[in-house]
Regions:
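A short, solvent-exposed, low-complexity linear motif enriched for acidic/polar residues
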Residues: 21-292
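C-terminal motif of bacterial Sec signal peptides marking the signal peptidase cleavage site
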Residues: 16-19
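Bacterial N-terminal signal peptides that target proteins for export
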Residues: 1-11
Length: 292
């Protein structure tokens, strides 16, 4: 089991005590942070090595809330369909934080740190400026005094993994990250009729609002996430589970061309076999079946 060292500098605690009204009340709160992943079709495994988590208070210097010893190497492809893995569960000074930084070990030419496995071959996976900046989420969070802040970071690998044209064989990770409050998210799940599926690697793209589905190309509408369509061995049905959705309407569209969807270009060959609108509700799983 990985060991987590909590390291809170006195200066950060003092500054946040003042922000919370001094020492007359409860000046700490708990923060829980997990990671999950949206589907990607072309890889057998995507390993990211995390070495710690850093927080930046609104007032005061950043500090490492967790230092992993040894580092934690997590296969993000195992974290789909609502599955997540906890990174930290720690007590910190209550207050507002400007950003969260995930410290990662990901270097060019070194597949023993972070890596991607494709067709059985393992390739280095590196993050530009990863050693200096890590993976930073700048949306900001609030840890309530005497309360619990419970978040999940969603890695969308379909948008994040790129193969540069430098001949090295190293893959680059430019993460598309979503920081989600677990108390505010729900899921949409259901079946996809076998008659709609034209291949073995199909996914359901999820778009915010009522829109016409499009491929991943960096222009709106881009999916906020996607979910793999997998065969349920018990029922024989093809199922998907799109999790960690903020409450509101979404367009869901299955495609069996996701493996060829290049996030850097507009792929006219990505065909959606159906499209339906569903409304996600916090803390609920909404059912939506594609019947053909």
């Amino acid at each position: 089991m990985s060991k987590i060292r909590t390291n809170l500098p006195p200066a950060a605690a003092v500054l946040l005590l003042a922000a919370c009204g001094g020492g007359g009340g409860d000046a700490t709160g708990d923060i829980s942070l997990a990671v999950t992943d949206a589907a990607v079709d072309s890889a057998d495994a995507v390993w990211v090595q995390f070495s710690g988590v850093e927080l930046k208070p609104q007032s005061g210097p950043a500090f490492m809330v967790a230092d992993f010893g040894p580092p934690r190497r997590i296969n993000l492809l195992e974290l789909q369909s609502g599955v997540s893995e906890q990174l930290i569960d720690a007590t910190v000074p209550a207050g507002r934080y400007n950003w969260i930084r995930l410290a990662v070990d990901a270097e060019q030419g070194d597949a023993t740190l972070s890596s991607i496995v494709i067709a059985g071959a393992e390739h280095p996976l590196w993050v530009p400026s990863g050693d200096e900046t890590g993976l930073k989420l700048v949306s900001g969070v609030v840890v309530p005094a005497g309360g619990q802040a419970d978040f999940t970071i969603d890695f969308d690998l379909r948008k994040s993994v790129h193969l540069p044209n430098d001949g090295s064989g190293d893959y680059m990770l430019r993460p598309a990250l979503r920081l989600l409050d677990n108390t505010e998210v729900g899921a949409v799940a259901g079946t996809v009729a076998a008659s709609l599926l034209t291949g073995d690697e199909c996914s359901v793209y999820v778009f915010a609002g009522d829109v016409t589905p499009d491929d991943v190309d960096g222009t709106d509408p881009d999916p906020v996430t996607s979910a793999a369509v997998v065969l349920d061995p018990d029922s024989g049905e093809w199922r998907y589970h799109a999790a960690f959705l903020l409450a509101g309407p979404y367009t869901l569209a299955p495609t069996c061309d996701a493996a060829s969807d290049d996030p850097a270009v507009d792929d006219a060959g990505v065909v959606f076999v159906a499209s339906e609108v569903a409304t996600a509700v916090a803390n609920e799983v909404v059912s939506l079946d594609f019947t053909g």
